[in-house]
Amino acid sequence: MPNRLLITNVSIARMDQPDDGYGLMTHAALLIQDGKIEWLGSVSDIPAGLGEPEELDACGRLLTPALIDCHTHIVHGGNRAREFEMRLEGASYEEIARAGGGIISTVTATRETDEAALLQDALKRADALIAEGVGLIEIKSGYGLDVETELKMLRVARAIERERPVRVVTSFLGAHAVPKGADADFYIDKVCIPALEAAHKEGLVDAVDGFCEGIAFDTVQMGRLFERARQLDIPVKLHAEQLSNIGGTKLAASYNALSIDHVEYADKTDIAAMAKAGSVAVLLPGAFYTLHETQKPFVEAFRSESVPIAVATDWNPGSSPMGSLLLAMNMSCTLFGLTPVEALAGTTRNAARALGLKDCGIVAPGKRADLAIWDVLEPAELSYRFGVNPLHRRIFGGRL
C-alpha cells in the first residue's frame, strides 16, 4: 500500500505565485502520497476511492511549506560573547576583525574542535530551527581556512541530514576570511581552490560562496575562485555589499549566482545586474541588527526590478547569533520594510530558489511534502509575533 496522509479542515498558504500573495485556500484538504503532495483542493472535492489513508484534522489551522533557512553558519566551534561586549564598548566589526577577532577567532576554535563535538553542537542548533518548522537548512563551511578543517565542517553538515529529519544543502565558503599572517592571493590559489577541489571530489559541495569585502577578498580574487567553480560545474553565491560596495554584486551576477547575500550597499546598477542574472537577494536582518548597521538594503529597487527576495538567519557566532527564522521574518519587516507576504515568500519559495531547488518551497502537486501546520488564524501572524513559537506540527517527507 502506498504511504498516504490526508489532511483535512485546513487553510493552505500555497506560496506558489509571486503575484498571488499567500495563495490562500480555506476549507481545504491536502493528500500526500509517498512523500510528495498528490492533490489539494476544497474539502468538498476530496477524490473518491482513496481507500483508508492516515487522516489528520487540522481544525482550521494554517498550513504552509516547511520553512527554509537559506543562509547559516551553524557548524562551528566556540562562541564570541566577549566580542559582543567589545562592540557594546565601542569597537566596530572591522576593528575586531583586524585585531584578530571576528571570523579568525572562530577559525581557531573550529580547528581545535573534533568532528564529533562539532556535530553535537551543530545538531543542537539544527534542532532549534526544526522546532520552528524549518525543513531545509543551508550550511556553510568557512571557519577552517585550511583543507582539513573545511572538509571537516562539510562532513559535519552532511551528517546532520543523517541524524535529523531535515534536508541540508552545503556551501563551500573557503573564501570567508584571510588567515592571520597570510597573503590573500596565495591563500586563494594555494589553499582555498585546492580545498574546494578536495571537497568537490568527496561530494561535499552544493555551491561555492565567498565574502567579497574590504576586510576579506576583492573581486579579482573571488573571480579566480568562481572561475574554478564554473569549471567544476558548481553554482556560486556571494556575501557582497554588506559593509561597503566594492563590486561583488556585479561579479557574482556575471557568474549567474544563485543568490547574493547581505546587499545593504547594493545600488541600482547592482540590482539591475541581479535581475538580469536571475539572482536572489538574501536579506540577513540579524547581522544588520547585531552590528548596529544603518545602511538598509534597497528593497524598493529589488521590487521594481523583480529581484526575488529571500530572508535567512545568517546564524553564526559573531555577527548574527540568532537561532530563529521566525524572528528573522519579523526583523525583515520591522527593519527592512518587507511585507508579511514577502517575508513568508522569502523563507519558502524564494529561499528554495536561492538554493537552486525546484522541488520545495511551495504547496503544489508533485512537490515534496515538507510542510508546517501553525496555530495561527492568518499567515501574517508568522511575521507579526515574536518570542512565541506557533508551530503545531511539522511534516517532513510526508511523515508526521
Give the residues covered by each predicted segment:
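N-terminal metal-binding scaffold of metallo-dependent hydrolase/deaminase domains
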Residues: 1-49
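Conserved beta-strand scaffold positions in the cores of enzyme catalytic domains, especially
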Residues: 6, 53-57, 394
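Divalent metal-coordination and catalytic microenvironments
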Residues: 10, 30, 35, 60, ...
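Residue-level recognition of short, solvent-exposed, well-ordered loop/turn junctions
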Residues: 51, 364-367
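Metal-associated gating/positioning segment near the N- to mid-region
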Residues: 58-121
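Metal-coordinating catalytic core of metallo-dependent amide/deamination hydrolases
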Residues: 106-121, 127, 135-246
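Generic structural signal for hydrophobic
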Residues: 129, 199, 225, 229, ...
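Active-site-adjacent C-terminal substructures of enzyme catalytic domains
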Residues: 235, 245-362, 374-376, 380, ...
